[in-house]
C-alpha cells in the first residue's frame, strides 16, 4: 500500500461568532474531506508536546513521528538544509524573517509578503554590510531567510514574530537563557538594530513605500539550533523505499531533507492562497507512481490565519478540498495498488489570535477496505467522536503506516 499525507497548514481554528459559533472547518464546504471522514476513521492528534512552542517545525515533525526531546534543534537548521546550507560543527542557524517595523512597533512578520526576488536584494545587501567570517546571511523564500553564526550559543529566548503583531519590538528582542549565551544574544540584537539603520532608506524599500507596500526594514532572527541528528523515514518504516515531500516552505523541505524524502519543486507553488494546487496535485500523483510515501504540505490556510482573514481562510480550506483532496482521491481510489490518504493540519492557527495554538488537531485516515467509524464530517468537533480517540507522539504515523 502507498501512503499520502495531505496537510493543510494551520487549518484548524476556534469557533467564530460571525459564522454562528462554528469553526471554519465546520462552516466551509468540504464535500471530499467529509466523504473521506465518513468512509474512513477519525481522531485527534497532539502535535505539540508538553514544553514545546507550537511552531510549524514542532508540529510537522510530530506528524511524522519524530521524538522531539531527542532530535529537536529548532527551525533554523531545518531551513538551512532546505536551501543547501551545510552546517558545520559549532555553527548555529537561525530563521531570519524580513519584517516590517513602524516606529517602535512590529507591524507584521512578513513585510507584506515580500517577493523572493525583492528579498534577495536586501539579504545580499545585509551580507555585504554585516556579513563576516562569523556571520552569514542566506536568502530563502519570500520573507523567510537564514542567519548562520559561527560559535553561536543556542540557549536564547527568541520570540517568533508572527506571535506578536502590533507589539513593541524592543522588549521582545533576544534574551540569553544562560550566562554563556549573553554574547550571542548581544550579537543578534546588534544585528537587528544595524539592519534597521541599513534598510530604512534602501532604494527597494523607498520604492515599496511609494507603491503603498510595507517596507522590509528589519531582520528578526529566531529559533536557533545546530545540525540535528534525525533518523530517516525509511529507517523508521523500512517498507518505505522511496518518499517525497512537496511544499513551498523551506522549513518543511528541510524536515524532508533530514527525513530522507526527496524534494519535488513545483512551478507556481507560492505558499499563499494563489498557490498552484493543480501543479502540486499533479506532482503528488506522479510521485505516488514510483514512491511509497508522499508528504503534500499546503501552506495557504496557515498564512490566512496569520492575517486574521476569515474569508480568505475559508477560501483556502475549500480550495484544499476541491483542488487537492478531491482530485487526489478521485485519481487513486481505483488504482491497482491501494493508496492510503490522511488529511490533517499541523496545528490550529485561529484567525482571532493570528498565531499558532497547541490544541489537538483533527485527522482522518482512509484507504480501500478500512472499517469506518461513526463520524460523518471532517472538523474539530466531529473528530472528538472518532474511533482513534486522542493520539500522541508517534501513534498517528504508526497507525497510518501499518
Show where each model-derived region lies.
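Feature captures the catalytic ectodomains and active-site-proximal regions of enzymes
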Residues: 1-402
Amino acid at each position: 500500500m502507498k501512503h499520502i499525507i495531505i496537510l493543510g497548514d494551520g487549518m484548524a481554528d476556534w469557533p467564530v461568532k460571525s459564522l454562528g459559533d462554528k469553526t471554519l472547518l465546520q462552516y466551509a464546504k468540504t464535500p471530499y474531506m467529509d466523504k473521506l471522514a465518513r468512509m474512513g476513521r477519525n481522531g485527534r492528534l497532539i502535535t505539540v508536546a508538553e514544553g514545546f512552542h507550537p511552531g510549524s517545525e514542532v508540529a510537522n515533525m510530530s506528524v511524522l513521528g519524530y521524538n522531539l526531546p531527542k532530535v529537536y534543534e529548532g527551525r533554523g537548521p531545518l531551513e538551512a538544509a532546505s536551501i543547501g546550507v551545510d552546517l558545520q560543527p559549532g555553527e548555529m542557524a537561525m530563521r531570519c524573517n524580513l519584517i516590517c517595523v513602524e516606529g517602535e512597533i512590529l507591524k507584521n512578520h512578513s513585510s507584506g509578503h515580500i517577493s523572493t526576488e525583492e528579498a534577495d536584494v536586501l539579504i545580499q545587501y545585509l551580507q555585504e554590510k554585516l556579513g563576516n567570517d562569523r556571520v552569514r546571511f542566506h536568502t530563502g523564500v519570500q520573507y523567510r531567510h537564514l542567519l548562520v553564526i559561527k560559535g553561536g550559543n543556542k540557549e536564547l529566548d527568541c520570540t517568533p514574530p508572527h506571535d506578536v503583531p502590533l507589539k513593541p519590538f524592543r522588549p521582545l528582542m533576544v534574551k540569553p537563557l544562560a550566562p554563556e549565551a549573553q554574547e550571542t544574544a548581544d550579537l543578534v540584537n546588534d544585528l537587528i538594530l544595524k539592519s534597521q539603520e541599513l534598510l530604512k532608506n534602501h532604494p527597494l524599500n523607498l520604492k515599496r513605500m511609494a507603491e503603498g507596500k510595507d517596507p522590509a526594514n528589519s531582520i528578526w532572527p529566531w529559533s536557533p539550533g545546530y545540525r540535528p541528528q534525525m533518523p530517516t523515514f525509511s529507517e523508521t518504516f523500512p517498507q518505505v523505499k522511496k518518499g517525497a515531500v512537496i511544499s513551498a516552505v523551506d522549513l518543511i523541505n528541510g524536515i524532508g531533507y533530514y527525513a530522507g524524502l526527496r524534494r519535488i519543486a513545483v512551478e507556481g507553488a507560492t505558499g499563499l492562497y494563489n498557490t498552484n494546487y493543480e501543479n502540486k496535485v499533479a506532482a503528488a500523483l506522479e510521485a505516488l507512481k514510483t514512491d511509497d510515501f508522499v508528504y503534500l504540505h499546503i501552506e495557504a490556510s496557515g498564512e490566512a490565519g496569520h492575517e486574521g482573514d476569515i474569508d480568505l481562510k475559508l477560501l483556502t480550506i475549500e480550495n484544499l478540498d476541491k483542488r487537492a483532496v478531491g482530485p487526489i482521491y478521485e485519481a487513486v481510489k481505483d488504482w491497482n495498488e491501494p493508496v492510503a490518504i490522511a488529511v490533517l493540519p499541523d496545528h490550529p492557527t485561529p484567525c482571532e489570535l493570528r498565531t499558532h495554538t497547541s490544541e489537538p488537531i483533527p485527522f482522518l485516515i482512509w484507504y480501500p477496505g478500512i472499517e469506518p467509524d461513526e463520524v460523518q464530517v471532517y472538523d474539530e468537533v466531529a473528530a472528538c467522536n472518532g474511533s482513534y480517540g486522542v493520539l500522541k507522539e508517534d501513534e498517528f504515523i504508526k497507525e497510518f503506516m501499518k
